[in-house]
Amino acid sequence: MAANGAECEQPQKRLGPKDKQNGSSTDSSLRERKQLDREERLSLVLWKRPFITLQYFFLETAITLKEWTWKLWQRRGVVFLTVVLFSLFSLAYSIEGAHQEYVQHLEKKFLWCAYWVGLGILSSVGLGTGLHTFLLYLGPHIASVTLAAYECGSVNFPEPPYPAQIVCPEDEALQESISLWTIMSKVRLEACMWGAGTAIGELPPYFMARAARMSGADPDDEDYEEFEEMLEHSQSAQDFASRAKLAVQNMVQKVGFFGILACASIPNPLFDLAGITCGHFLIPFWTFFGATLIGKAIIKMHIQKLFVIITFSKHIVEQMVSLIGVIPGVGASLQKPFREYLEAQRTKLHNPAGDGAAAGESWLSWVFEKVVLVMVCYFILSIINSMAQSYAKRLQQKKYSEEKTK
C-alpha cells in the first residue's frame, strides 16, 4: 500500500513545477497589467487630458454623493438626532439673553479648534500633494506669536483682533516676563488641535488595511500592495528604505502601543506604513488611535512647537539677520528686505488697524502669500485629479470582474 501510495503521489510531483510555472506566469502578467493600468490612471490629469479628467471627476463626485446619501439613510436615526440637536443649538444661538456671552465664546473656540483640526487632516491626508499645513499655517502662526511676545513684552493680545491680527496691548501693566513656557502655553490649543487633526488623517490607511485583512479582498491600493510585497520579500531586503520600513513594521507589530507611540512622536515619512501595519495585523482601534493621538497631538507637537519658538526668539532672529549681512557681495542687499520686514512687523504690532500708519507691504510677505495661494490651487487641482483617477479605477475593476465572469 505504501508503494501504491508513492506511485499515486509521483504524477502529482511531476505536475507541480508546471503548475507553479503557470501560476507564476499568470501572476506576472496580472502584475504587469495592473502596472499598466496604474500608469494609465496616473496620466489622467488636468494638464494632459482636461476634458476626460473633468468628466471623470464629476462622475466620481456623483457616485460619492450617492454612496454617502445611502449611508446617511441607513443611519437615519443618528442623522435625525443630530438634526434635532443642531436645531436646539441654533435656537439657543438666535434667542437673545444673558447666555449669548457664553454662546459666542463657545462658538469662537469651536470654530478656532475646527479650523486647526481641518488643517491637520489636510496635512496628514494630502491626497498626494505633499501639502504640509504646518509649514504654511501653524509654523508661521507660532513664529508670529513668538516675535510679537518679545516685542510687546506680553502674550495678552487684545481679543479681538487676535487671533486674526496680533496687536500689542496698550496697557503697560499687562506686560510680563516672557519665557519659553509662556509662549508655548499661548499656542498650545491650536498646536494640539492641529496634531489631533493629523492623527485623524492617519485613520484611512488603518481602516483600509483592516478591512482588506478581515474580508480577504484585494483593495487595489498601491501602498497596501507595496506593504504585502515587503512582507513577502522581508528576508531579502537590502536597500536602506526597505530596511527602515521593515524596522517600523517590526516595532509596531512587536512593541504594540509604545511602538506606535514612538513612531507617531518622531517626525518621519513612514508613519503611513504604521497605520497599514496596525490594520493588517488587526491591532485594536483604540490602541492604534490612542497612541497616535498622544504621539502626534502632545509629544510631537511640543517638539515642533519648541523648535519654532527657539528659532524665532528675538536674539536668534537678530543674529540670523546679522549673519546674512556677512555674506560676501550680496549680503547687504539680502539683509535689507529682512530688516525692512521685521521693522514693518514691529510697526504693525504697535499700530492697530484704522490708525492710518499702515506699513508698506514687504516683498517677503507678498512672496509668501503667493506661495500659499499656489499651494492651495495645486491642492484643489490634485483633488480633481485624484477623484478622476478613482473613477478610472472603478472602470478598470469593473472590466476585471466582467472578464472573470466570462
Curated annotation (Swiss-Prot):
Catalytic activity: a 1,2-diacyl-sn-glycero-3-phospho-L-serine(in) = a 1,2-diacyl-sn-glycero-3-phospho-L-serine(out); cholesterol(in) = cholesterol(out); a 1,2-diacyl-sn-glycero-3-phosphocholine(in) = a 1,2-diacyl-sn-glycero-3-phosphocholine(out); a 1,2-diacyl-sn-glycero-3-phosphoethanolamine(in) = a 1,2-diacyl-sn-glycero-3-phosphoethanolamine(out)
Keywords, alphabetical: Cell membrane, Endoplasmic reticulum, Lipid transport, Membrane, Transmembrane, Transmembrane helix, Transport, Vacuole
Region described as Disordered: 1-34
Compositionally biased spans, kind Basic and acidic residues: 10-21
Transmembrane segments: 78-98, 110-130, 251-271, 274-294, 307-327, 364-384
Family recorded in the similarity comment: Belongs to the VMP1 family.
Function: Phospholipid scramblase involved in lipid homeostasis and membrane dynamics processes. Has phospholipid scramblase activity toward cholesterol and phosphatidylserine, as well as phosphatidylethanolamine and phosphatidylcholine. Required for autophagosome formation: participates in early stages of autophagosome biogenesis at the endoplasmic reticulum (ER) membrane by reequilibrating the leaflets of the ER as lipids are extracted by atg2 (atg2a or atg2b) to mediate autophagosome assembly.
Domain commentary: The VTT domain was previously called the SNARE-assoc domain. As there is no evidence that this domain associates with SNARE proteins, it was renamed as VMP1, TMEM41, and TVP38 (VTT) domain.
The name this protein goes by in its record: Vacuole membrane protein 1
Native organism: Danio rerio
Taxonomic path: Eukaryota, Metazoa, Chordata, Craniata, Vertebrata
